[in-house]
């Protein structure tokens, strides 16, 4: 009998929307063949949930929670198929329940956290609202000694956690708001991946005004434009959104702090969405209600 790996169970869960134990059992009975397992599941009571899981869940919401003393914070993305469901009280309550578990466990291992009670709650929600619901990802961040974590959620769709060394909760939240609005690539210029810099350098060298320039002059121009690129895409160097006369680093420093880093979630980023027109979406909602 083939060994059933955790990754195989996870894949089956993602494709069917069913519980971990049910997926493991199905894989065991199918001798590790995931397609056979899906076929068997669709022949039994898992048919309805399995069909729902085939639909793309690229809408949803982001929720956060920060410890009262600001020492750590968590953020979670939960996906639904439509924005309409993402605003439903049942969906919101489920997301809050899951983020509470993430906060309590201080763990971003969504697969493990979704075992048992939370997975049962998810399956019940799927049956109740008629859409595929997926707990996509979570993150846990901790502040250094004397530091603070800040959080900001915009419209339920963009969430940010920031970490400061020193500073205070208000400043940390302000920086999180800036990240939500401006979406910097990295916290500090030195954090920019070399591959990203190489790509930008190639773009600069291909620009018309670089043609025919002596190597020394061209290199100076490249370095100048890379410096500008880093300033525009690094959180600490950007003009602070609430006061463009100072950089984010200057704003934080004035409060006795220093930017450590940030994490930004935006609902559905990286998920390929299906194109569905509005009329069709309304008809689907009416059919499920």
Curated annotation (Swiss-Prot):
Question: Cellular component per GO?
Answer: cytoplasm
Q: Where in the cell is it found?
A: Cytoplasm
Keywords from the UniProt entry:
Cytoplasm, Elongation factor, Protein biosynthesis
Q: What is a GO molecular function of this protein?
A: translation elongation factor activity
Which residue ranges does the record annotate as region Involved in Mg(2+) ion dislocation from EF-Tu?
82-85
Q: What InterPro entries is this protein classified in? A: EF-Ts_dimer_sf (IPR036402), Transl_elong_EFTs/EF1B (IPR001816), Transl_elong_EFTs/EF1B_dimer (IPR014039), Transl_elong_Ts_CS (IPR018101), UBA-like_sf (IPR009060)
Q: What does this protein do?
A: Associates with the EF-Tu.GDP complex and induces the exchange of GDP to GTP. It remains bound to the aminoacyl-tRNA.EF-Tu.GTP complex up to the GTP hydrolysis stage on the ribosome.
Name-wise, this protein is Elongation factor Ts
Organism of this sequence:
Chromohalobacter salexigens (strain ATCC BAA-138 / DSM 3043 / CIP 106854 / NCIMB 13768 / 1H11)
Source species taxonomy: Bacteria, Pseudomonadati, Pseudomonadota, Gammaproteobacteria, Oceanospirillales
**Chain's gene name:** tsf
């Amino acid at each position: 009998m083939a060994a059933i790996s955790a990754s195989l169970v996870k894949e089956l869960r993602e494709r069917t929307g069913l519980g971990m134990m049910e997926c493991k059992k199905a894989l065991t009975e199918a001798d590790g063949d995931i397609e056979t397992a899906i076929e068997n599941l669709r022949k039994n009571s898992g048919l309805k949930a399995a069909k729902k899981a085939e639909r793309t869940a690229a809408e949803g919401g982001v929720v956060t929670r920060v410890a009262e003393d600001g020492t750590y914070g968590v953020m979670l993305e939960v996906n639904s198929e439509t924005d309409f469901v993402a605003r439903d009280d049942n969906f919101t309550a489920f997301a809050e329940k899951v983020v509470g578990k993430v906060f309590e466990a201080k763990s971003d291992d969504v697969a493990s956290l979704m075992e048992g009670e939370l997975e049962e709650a998810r399956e019940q929600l799927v049956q109740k609202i008629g859409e595929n619901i997926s707990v996509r990802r979570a993150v846990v961040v901790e502040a250094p000694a004397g530091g603070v974590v800040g959080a900001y959620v915009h419209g339920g769709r963009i969430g940010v956690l920031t970490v400061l060394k020193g500073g205070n909760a208000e400043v940390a939240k302000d920086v999180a708001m800036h990240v939500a609005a401006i979406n910097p690539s990295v916290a500090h210029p030195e954090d920019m991946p070399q591959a990203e810099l190489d790509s930008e350098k190639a773009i600069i060298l291909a620009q018309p005004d670089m043609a025919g320039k002596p190597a020394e002059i061209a290199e100076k121009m490249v370095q100048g434009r890379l410096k500008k690129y880093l300033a525009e895409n690094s959180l600490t160097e950007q003009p602070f959104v609430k006061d463009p006369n100072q950089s984010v680093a200057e704003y934080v420093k004035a409060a006795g702090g220093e930017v450590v880093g940030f994490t930004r979630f935006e609902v559905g980023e990286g998920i390929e969405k299906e194109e569905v027109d509005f009329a069709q979406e309304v008809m689907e909602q009416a059919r499920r209600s």
